[in-house]
Amino acid sequence: MEHKKLDELIVQIENYLECWKQFNHYLSLARTKKFGQEDENQFLEVKSVLAQELEMIISAVEFSNPSKDEVHALLGGATSLRFLSELNDGAFRNLENQWHKIYIGLQSILGQLKVQQRQTGLSAT
């Protein structure tokens, strides 16, 4: 992959990971039941960005973990903060575990791209 495109992809995935952190923030709000309508609106926006950006990342780099289906299942299952706040503890922990698995998978992809970036930088000199 061209060095400039690799740099752009790394920045894109870093930004994507920040959105995943925001998603986790909203999970915390749902768990504590401390959220309002604006939080609900922002949660929907974060989910939209996560779904759209996933497609852009998939078009640029191949990976199997996390799978598109896993990401869509998590986003689709988290319909609203109100819904999440009503989940029993076991179901909520399962949701958090799904989030963590996806987040770690994305971090791994980012790490692999940074290795490529370093190798590309070394070969360019």
Question: Can you say where each PLM-predicted feature lies in the sequence?
Answer:
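Conserved non-transmembrane functional hotspots
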Residues: M1-T125
